[in-house]
C-alpha cells in the first residue's frame, strides 16, 4: 500500500493613529519571528514569564540558518558561529558592549547606499538610528540573510516596512527608553516658547536689552491639546497638568480609562485644534498623518495658538506653517523635527523670528542614549535567539497577559495548520481555509490574531519555496491566492480558558487520507489544549485524543481486535518508540482511525509493512 509523507516547520504580519496600523508599545508583546538555526538548535520561547514550548527540532546548516520554533534548550548554541550585527550609526557604549557579548559587531558609520547593500549581504542584523535609509533595495541586496532590523529610537519611517515584511525580516524599535527625554524636551520647548527664552537670549548676546519686546504668556489655565496619546504624549500631559494646564487629547486608539486617570479628556481632532492655546504633536508619520497640519488645519485653529513638534517633521506642511505664522494664526512654533533633516539654512521656517528650533534633540540625554542603546541591543539579540520581542512593528502584537494565556493555543494553532496542509495531498489545490474557534467567551474577549497567524504559518510553510515566518506568512498566503476565513462559535464550557477548541478546514480539495474528510466533504481536523499540552481531538468525523508531539501516523482501518498490537509490534521491531496511541470510531466494528505518536521517523520499509496490514485501508505519516 502506498503511503503519504509530508513535512513542515514554525510565524505573520504588521504597526497607529488615523491609519489602521497600531504603533509599537511596551504594553504589547509579539510572538518571535524566527529562531536562528545557526545559533540555536532549539529554544524555549517565553511569553513574558510564561513558557511557550514547542517540540520541533531544527537542522543546522549554513544555507538554511534560521529556524522557526524549536524547544529542547533554553539557550542558543555558543559553539556555533556568532551572528554578524551591522551598526551604521552611533550607538551608546553599553548597547554595543551587550551586542559584542552575543555576536560579531561591525560599527560602520556614514555608509553610502551601495556600501550599505554590500554590508547587509553579510549581516544577520542591522541597527540604525534615523539617518540610515533601509529601503527595498537594501532588503533585496541582503538576499534573505538579514533577519532583524533594529531602529534605535521610536520612529520607523526610514525603514521600508512592507519590503521588510515581504522578505521575512523582523523590524524592532526602542520606544520606551527615550520616552521621558522626549516628553521633557517637549515641555522645555513649550515653556521656552511661552517666555521667548531663545529670542531673548539671542537679543542679549547681540548687545540689546529688550524687556518690553519679549513679554510672554502664562501656562497656568491654558489649554494644551496633545495630539497623540501614546507614551510620549502621556508623559507630556502628565507634566503639563503639573504646570496647571488643562489638557485635552486626540488619539483614535487611546484607551479612555488611561486618559481619565490623568484627568485628560479625549476629543475629536477638530475640537482639539480649535479650542487649544497650545498644540503639542506626538503622532507617528504615516500616510494618514503626512502633512495633516496644513492650510486647512491651521485655518481651524484659535488665533494666536502656539505649536510644538517633537514627533516627526513630515506631519506638518512647513510652507503652510510659514503662512500661518505670517498671518498671526500661529503665534509661535517650537520645532525639534523637520521634513528634511538637517533643514536648509535658507529655510523661511527656520529663519522665522517666531520659531524656536532644535536639531532633533528629543532623545538626546545621556540617560536616554544609554537606555535606547541597551533596549535595542536586547531586542535585536533576543530576536536572533528567538525570544519574544515586545517592540516588533511588523508582526502581530497582543497584550502580554493575553499572550501568556494564549501560549499553548498558539502552538496548537500552528500544528493544526501544518497537519491540515499535509493531509491535502501536499497542498495541491489549496485555496480556501476555514478556521472555527469554539469558546465560551464573548467575541470581544477573544483575540485571535496570533492564532490565525500561526495557522497561516503552518499551512504555508510546506507549500512555499520561500522563507516563511510569522512576519511574512500572510503576505505569501495572499501571493498564493489563499483565502483564510474565521468563524467563532459560543459553546457551553468554562470561560476560564480562552479557547475550547480550534478546527481547521481545507475546502474543496482532495485528500491523500480519506479518513480526514468530514461529512461535508472537506478536510477537517480539530484540536484542544489539555493540561497545557496541544492535543488532536478529531480527524474528519473520527474522534481521537493524541498529544501533538514528535511525529504522527494516522491509519484508517477496519475496527477489529488486535490492530494496536500488530502496528505496535512492527514499530517495535524497527526500534521506533511509540509514545501514544489512540483509536477513534464512529460505529462499533465498522471503520476506525488509529493515531500513533512516534519519536523517530520510520523508514520506508517500516511504513510499507504497516500499510501491508490487511485491515488497514490507508495511512499517512505526518511530521509535527
UniProtKB/Swiss-Prot annotation:
Name of the gene this protein is made from: PGDH2
Residues that bear Phosphoserine: 71
Binding site for NAD(+): 231-232, 251, 310-312, 336, 360-363
Residues annotated as domain ACT: 552-624
Family in the record: Belongs to the D-isomer specific 2-hydroxyacid dehydrogenase family.
InterPro entries xrefs: ACT-like_dom_sf, ACT_dom, ASB_dom_sf, D-isomer_2_OHA_DH_cat_dom, D-isomer_DH_CS, D-isomer_DH_CS1, D-isomer_DH_NAD-bd, NAD(P)-bd_dom_sf
Catalyzed reaction equations: (2R)-3-phosphoglycerate + NAD(+) = 3-phosphooxypyruvate + NADH + H(+)
Location of the active site: 312, 341, 360
Name of the molecule in the record: D-3-phosphoglycerate dehydrogenase 2, chloroplastic
One MF annotation (Gene Ontology) recorded for this entry: phosphoglycerate dehydrogenase activity
Function: Involved in the plastidial phosphorylated pathway of serine biosynthesis (PPSB).
Effect of disrupting the coding gene: No visible phenotype.
Stated regulation of activity: Inhibited by 90 uM 3-phosphonooxypyruvate, but not by Ser, Thr, Val, Gly Trp, O-acetyl-L-Ser and Cys.
Pfam families to which the protein is assigned, alphabetical: 2-Hacid_dh, 2-Hacid_dh_C, ACT, PGDH_inter
Organism: Arabidopsis thaliana (Mouse-ear cress)
Tissue expression profile of the protein: Ubiquitous, but highly expressed in roots and in dark-grown leaf tissues. Expressed in the vasculature, stigma, anther filaments and shoot apical meristem. Not detected in the root meristem or in embryo.
Coiled-coil regions listed in the entry: none
Locations listed in the record: Plastid, Chloroplast
PANTHER family: D-3-PHOSPHOGLYCERATE DEHYDROGENASE 2, CHLOROPLASTIC, FORMATE DEHYDROGENASE 1
Amino acid at each position: 500500500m502506498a503511503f503519504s509523507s509530508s513535512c513542515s516547520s514554525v510565524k505573520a504580519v504588521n504597526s497607529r493613529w488615523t491609519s489602521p496600523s497600531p504603533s509599537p508599545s511596551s504594553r504589547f508583546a509579539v510572538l518571535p519571528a524566527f529562531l536562528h538555526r545557526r545559533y540555536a538548535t532549539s529554544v524555549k520561547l517565553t511569553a513574558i514569564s510564561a513558557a511557550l514550548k514547542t517540540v520541533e527540532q531544527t537542522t543546522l546548516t549554513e544555507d538554511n540558518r534560521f529556524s522557526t520554533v524549536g524547544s529542547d534548550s533554553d539557550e542558543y548554541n555558543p559553539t556555533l558561529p556568532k551572528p554578524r550585527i551591522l551598526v551604521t550609526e552611533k550607538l551608546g557604549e553599553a548597547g554595543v558592549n551587550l551586542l559584542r557579548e552575543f555576536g560579531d559587531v561591525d560599527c560602520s558609520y556614514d555608509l553610502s547606499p551601495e556600501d550599505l547593500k554590500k554590508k547587509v549581504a553579510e549581516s544577520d542584523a542591522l541597527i540604525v538610528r534615523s539617518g540610515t535609509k533601509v529601503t527595498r533595495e537594501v532588503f533585496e541586496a541582503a538576499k534573505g540573510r538579514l533577519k532583524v532590523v533594529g531602529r534605535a529610537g521610536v520612529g520607523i519611517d526610514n525603514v521600508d516596512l512592507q519590503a521588510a515584511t515581504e522578505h521575512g525580516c523582523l523590524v524592532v524599535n526602542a520606544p520606551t527608553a527615550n520616552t521621558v527625554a522626549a516628553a521633557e524636551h517637549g515641555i522645555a520647548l513649550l515653556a521656552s516658547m511661552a517666555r521667548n527664552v531663545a529670542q531673548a537670549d539671542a537679543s542679549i548676546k547681540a548687545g540689546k536689552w529688550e524687556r518690553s519686546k519679549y513679554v510672554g504668556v502664562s501656562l497656568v489655565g491654558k489649554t494644551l491639546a496633545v495630539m497623540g496619546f501614546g507614551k510620549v504624549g502621556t508623559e507630556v500631559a502628565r507634566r503639563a497638568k503639573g504646570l496647571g494646564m488643562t489638557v485635552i487629547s486626540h488619539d483614535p486608539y487611546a484607551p479612555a480609562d488611561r486618559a481619565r486617570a490623568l484627568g485628560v479628556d479625549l476629543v475629536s481632532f477638530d475640537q482639539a485644534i480649535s479650542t487649544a492655546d497650545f498644540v503639542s504633536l506626538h503622532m507617528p508619520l504615516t500616510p494618514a498623518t503626512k502633512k495633516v497640519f496644513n492650510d486647512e488645519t491651521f485655518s481651524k485653529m484659535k488665533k494666536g495658538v502656539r505649536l510644538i513638534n517633537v514627533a516627526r517633521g513630515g506631519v506638518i506642511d512647513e510652507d503652510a506653517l510659514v503662512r500661518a505664522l505670517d498671518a498671526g494664526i500661529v503665534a509661535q512654533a517650537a520645532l525639534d523635527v523637520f521634513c528634511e533633516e538637517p533643514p536648509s539654512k535658507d529655510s523661511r521656517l527656520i529663519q522665522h523670528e517666531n520659531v524656536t528650533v532644535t536639531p532633533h534633540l528629543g532623545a538626546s540625554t545621556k540617560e536616554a542614549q544609554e537606555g535606547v542603546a541597551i533596549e535595542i541591543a536586547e531586542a535585536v539579540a533576543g530576536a536572533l535567539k528567538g525570544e519574544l520581542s515586545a517592540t516588533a512593528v511588523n508582526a502581530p502584537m497582543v497584550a502580554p497577559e493575553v499572550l501568556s494565556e494564549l501560549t499553548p493555543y498558539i502552538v496548537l494553532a500552528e500544528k493544526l495548520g501544518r497537519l491540515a496542509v499535509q493531509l491535502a495531498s501536499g497542498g495541491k489545490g489549496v485555496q480556501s481555509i476555514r478556521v472555527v474557534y469554539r469558546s465560551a467567551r464573548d467575541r470581544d474577549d477573544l483575540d485571535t490574531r496570533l492564532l490565525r497567524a500561526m495557522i497561516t504559518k503552518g499551512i504555508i510553510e510546506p507549500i512555499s519555496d520561500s522563507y516563511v515566518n510569522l512576519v511574512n506568512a500572510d503576505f505569501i498566503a495572499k501571493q498564493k491566492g489563499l483565502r483564510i476565513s474565521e468563524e467563532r462559535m459560543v459553546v457551553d464550557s468554562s470561560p476560564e480558558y480562552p479557547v475550547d477548541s480550534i478546527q481547521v478546514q481545507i475546502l474543496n480539495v482532495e485528500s491523500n487520507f480519506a479518513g480526514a474528510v468530514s461529512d461535508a466533504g472537506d478536510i477537517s481536523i480539530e484540536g484542544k489544549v489539555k493540561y497545557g499540552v496541544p492535543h488532536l481531538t478529531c480527524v474528519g468525523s473520527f474522534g481521537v485524543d493524541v498529544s501533538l508531539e514528535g511525529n504522527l501516523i494516522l491509519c484508517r482501518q477496519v475496527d477489529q481486535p488486535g490492530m494496536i498490537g500488530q502496528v505496535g509490534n512492527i514499530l517495535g521491531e524497527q526500534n521506533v518508540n511509540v509514545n501514544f496511541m489512540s483509536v477513534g470510531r464512529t460505529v462499533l466494528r465498522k471503520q476506525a482511525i488509529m493515531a500513533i505518536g512516534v519519536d523517530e521517523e520510520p523508514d520506508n520499509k517500516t511504513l510499507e509493512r504497516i500499510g501491508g496490514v490487511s485491515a488497514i485501508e490507508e495511512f499517512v505519516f505526518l511530521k509535527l
